A protein has these predicted regions:
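Conserved N-terminal substructure of TIR/SEFIR domains
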Residues: 1-59, 146-187
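Cross-kingdom TIR/SEFIR domain
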Residues: 23-32, 36, 46-133
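C-terminal interaction surface of TIR/SEFIR-family domains
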Residues: 96-187
Length: 187
């Protein structure tokens, strides 16, 4: 019997809107299956409520912004205590000292994203790879697995595509003539 893919999204207050980016990215994966996306209740969650939502998740996406805020710290600690599979993601252009220390103490390296498009690509690729479980836990058909392969290759190509930022003289530059000028000071 096919299992439901259960995902928990924890986020600091400044990245609350990115939860929706993750939901949309997952909805666009080209296969039909049962996926449950969970989060902490928005108003004064208890430890028990957080524990209940994280306890049997297949993946925890943790989004760290410029500062670590409640209840994100408890979500993080609970996910590790329950030995959940955590993917630490950060968008911290100006991290506070507390956020810097929080990042430093992570048992895994952080994946950086700078905008919603990058976050969606990272999560889509990760979920697609989770769905390709060797035991086919999620009951995908051969045609769906093939679609996932094509989807993963496309996302990998996007990841490897060079930035469109100007480089060299495209972004402005200075040309220096290094040829000797023998007749400059002749009278």
């Amino acid at each position: 019997m096919a299992e439901t893919l259960r995902i928990f999204v924890g986020a600091t207050r400044d990245l609350e809107a990115e939860r929706g980016v993750i939901g949309k990215a997952i909805a666009e994966i080209p296969v039909q299956l049962a996926i449950e996306i969970r989060r902490t209740p928005p108003l004064l969650p208890t430890y028990e409520e957080i524990f209940e939502r994280i306890a049997n998740c297949d993946r925890v996406y943790f989004l760290l912004g410029n500062d670590i805020t409640a209840p994100a710290g408890l979500e993080w600690a609970t996910a590790w205590r329950l030995e959940r599979s955590v993917l630490p993601l950060r968008c911290s252009p100006r991290p506070t000292p507390a956020a810097q220390e929080f990042q430093r103490l992570s048992p895994l390296p952080w994946l950086d994203f700078h905008n919603a498009t990058e976050l969606a690509r990272i999560v889509s690729l990760d979920v697609a790879r989770l769905l390709k479980h060797p035991a086919n836990r999620y009951g995908l058909l051969v045609a769906e697995l093939e679609r996932l392969d094509v989807y993963i290759r496309r996302l990998d190509r996007l990841q490897m595509a060079p930035d469109k930022a100007p480089s060299g003289a495209e972004g402005g530059g200075v040309l220096i003539d290094s040829r000797p000028r023998s007749h400059e000071n002749e009278t």
